[in-house]
Amino acid sequence: MSTIPTSGHIPVMLAEVLEMLCPRDGATYLDGTFGGGGYARAILGAARCTLWAIDRDPAAIRRGQALQAELRDAEGGMRLHMLQGGFGDMQGLLAESGVHSLDGVVLDLGVSSFQLDEVERGFSFRTDGPLDMRMGDTGPTAADIVNTMGESDLADIIYEYGEERMSRRVARAIVAARAQAPITTTFQLADIIRSVVPGDRSGIDPATRSFQGIRIHVNDELGQIVTGLEQALALLAPGGRLVVVSFHSLEDRLVKQALNRAAGRMPGPSRHDPRSMRAEQAAPDFRLLTSRALRPGETECRANPRARSARLRAAERLAVPDTQNSTHNNTSPQERRP
């Protein structure tokens, strides 16, 4: 095990991620969401491996470059390589550097703790900052969206991505408020939402779901997940593993569906769905390492409340397609511990 400089950033479910990824010497891995570098440090510390890391946030790239410098000082070599961009573009980004196959991929979905804590990024309604919400430094901001989007479209993204039942009411209030003055800060938007969405016994701030919906739209987060999962699975060599940590039901649903498809665990044929009545399906190339999503323990949740909603799923590319676990045989493959 290597000695890697430590960081104050504590990634969610780190022990479980490492157990599922099972880093080994000489292998090549990808951290598709570098963020604070917590997973990257742990992977590099667990084995003498090479790690490529992607993030679209310039601040994350700077943190990665600082870690590169620390590693050079500590080891005299270069095992960490940083790439700026979205993980949904991982194949193209890696191909430009001559990388076409990986032994493992880790994805930590959603907004990072650093982004939430940096007031000027405009992700949080708990502090007043500019209404930005971009994970990168290009594209429309949240302020652009809430001040220009039509009421119906605004309601749709808040409902679909934020799962806010009162989305129509929220959109109407936003449109009425912006007619008086532009909405430019997180406090402004949060107050508008709270004026029409009552609190409930859960203690969740009434602005939470609407902020989530707008943020997901601004960053095309679900689109990134769909393409990122597809590309990650395609890049994995036999024995390669994909480990994904998600934080809300929309993310977890996409991950579950993608991994189940890869492992051949799709619903059986139905006479009500002609598309399902196919005579034969190709043997799956993957097996699930998690029959259901893993969740953080209570100790971790007490130490880091943001971990409470985390879900981890993982899969491994098989050396030989599994002819015993076709689409028409939905028996779960026996889990093996890494």
Swiss-Prot record:
Function per UniProt: Specifically methylates the N4 position of cytidine in position 1402 (C1402) of 16S rRNA.
Supply the EC number(s). 2.1.1.199
Q: What is the lineage of its organism?
A: Bacteria, Pseudomonadati, Pseudomonadota, Alphaproteobacteria, Acetobacterales
Q: Which organism is it from?
A: Gluconacetobacter diazotrophicus (strain ATCC 49037 / DSM 5601 / CCUG 37298 / CIP 103539 / LMG 7603 / PAl5)
Superkingdom to which the source organism belongs: Bacteria
- GO MF annotations, alphabetized: rRNA (cytosine-N4-)-methyltransferase activity
* Name by which UniProt lists this protein: Ribosomal RNA small subunit methyltransferase H
Is rRNA processing a UniProt keyword of this protein? yes
- Residue sites binding S-adenosyl-L-methionine per the record: 37-39, 55, 87, 108, 115
